[in-house]
Amino acid sequence: MPVAPLASNSSPLSNIECTVPDRRGPDVTTENVDRHYLRMPHSERGMVVGLFGGSFNPPHQGHALVAEIALKRLGLDQLWWMVTPGNPLKSRNQLAPLAERIAESERVAADPRVKVTAFEQTLGTSYTANTLARVKARNPHVHFIWIMGADSLQTFHKWQKWQEIARTFPIAVIDRPGATLSFLSSKMARTFDFARVDEDDARILWKKRAPAWTFIHGPRSGLSSTAIRNGSSHSDAE
């Protein structure tokens, strides 16, 4: 069954700036990574928390924009910026050290509600589905939403247990260059067409029982980690 676009109200986006300011991050070393970043951030009962995971190799203002849109449109109390030790779908050869990616993430994550963390290193989980299951088990009274950029949807069905991910927490898909319309053809969008929530209801997505997902339109940054590593700054693909 084809997935039809949902009507959206663009007025909430008028208060979202396309440029997200930098903040000066701490002096991150291997020692204080162990001390400060390998535990799950503290959260209170009843909080609404976004989970934004990635290799962030390197992190950039496009990632910060996704985080800021998610905070505003979803009404999040916190957003956990989860720097993964590795990515099963990507080569480790070009992966910067974890401490470096954490330090850069702290620099670009401007909002104090963003909690940069690398707790997956401690869990020893290689796949998102396993990580989310552990997060859910340890925080039964917190309302989580999985955050992902729309450019990831085309390969989401290649993730291990991807349908289990969709059934663990509601998902918010944030618009990215080149994905505004193409996301409709993704296997995830077609498989879970029945579970799509109008983006006008994004602030109550946390109340929905998974599977539930929404696509959030908004300002888009063409910045790409791959392009930055290759010496450019923009890419339509990432």
Predicted regions and their residues:
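Nucleotidyltransferase catalytic core that binds NTPs
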Residues: 2-238
